[in-house]
């Protein structure tokens, strides 16, 4: 019988450590309508799409206050902690930017074909036919996630998203029957 670390989690009181009333002075707070934590592609896409939806409904936009959408990023700016390359399915970008040409996206182009080889030794390469599903990327775009993050952050700022770089979200603030985030 084996023992796993998950069976012995450290004692954490979630209610005290992660949720609480506001503690900072009023003059050090920024009231925002919606706070999005994380400046990766998902958080940035969320901020951009939300700003698109709010642009269609002025009443809701006005009800969210002076800063309707804020994105909290622990790095210097969005993309600063994103290191890898990726295969990107273009469907989300097409939905997010329907009027934009794929040539304008920050990618290195599309994958023209898929081929996977096994190399049993230095002299031999055996193609796997058909290509296993996890390795099928035909039609996907090759991109740098850091470059994509920086590009999306530019579009988010153009859409009116307030980006708080070098800011860590540490606690969810609960006050006056609404959620607040402590940064």
Language model feature labels by segment:
Residues 50-51, 160, 181:
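Generic helix-packing signal
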Residues 2-11, 29-31, 61-176:
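Conserved N-terminal/central alpha/beta ligand/cofactor-binding core
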Residues 177-183:
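Conserved small/polar residues in nucleotide/adenosyl-binding loops
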Residues 5-18, 46-52:
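Short coil-to-helix leader/linker segments, especially the first N-terminal amphipathic alpha-helix
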Residues 14-31, 56:
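A short, basic/flexible loop-to-alpha-helix module at the beginning of a structural domain
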Residues 29-70:
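N-terminal Rossmann-like FAD-binding beta1-loop-alpha1 element of flavoenzymes
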Residues 23-24, 134, 169, 182:
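A structured beta-alpha segment of the ubiquitous adenosine-cofactor-binding alpha/beta core
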Residues 39-41, 76-77, 183:
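Short polar catalytic/cofactor-binding loops
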């Amino acid at each position: 019988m084996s023992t796993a670390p998950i069976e012995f989690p450290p004692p954490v009181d979630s209610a005290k450590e992660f949720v609480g009333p506001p503690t900072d002075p009023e003059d050090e707070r920024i009231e925002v309508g919606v706070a999005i934590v994380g400046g990766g592609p998902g958080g940035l896409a969320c901020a951009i799409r939300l700003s698109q939806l709010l642009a269609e409904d002025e009443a809701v936009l006005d009800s969210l206050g002076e800063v309707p959408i804020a994105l909290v990023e622990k790095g210097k700016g969005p993309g600063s902690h994103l290191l890898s390359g990726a295969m990107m399915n273009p469907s989300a970008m097409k939905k997010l930017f329907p009027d934009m040409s794929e040539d304008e996206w920050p990618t290195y182009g599309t994958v023209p074909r898929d081929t996977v080889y096994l190399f049993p030794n230095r002299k031999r390469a055996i193609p796997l036919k058909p290509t296993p599903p996890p390795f099928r990327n035909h039609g996907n775009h090759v991109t740098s996630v850091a470059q994509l993050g920086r590009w999306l952050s530019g579009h988010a700022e153009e859409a009116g998203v307030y980006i708080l770089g070098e800011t860590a979200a540490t606690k969810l603030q609960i006050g006056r029957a609404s959620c607040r985030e402590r940064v």
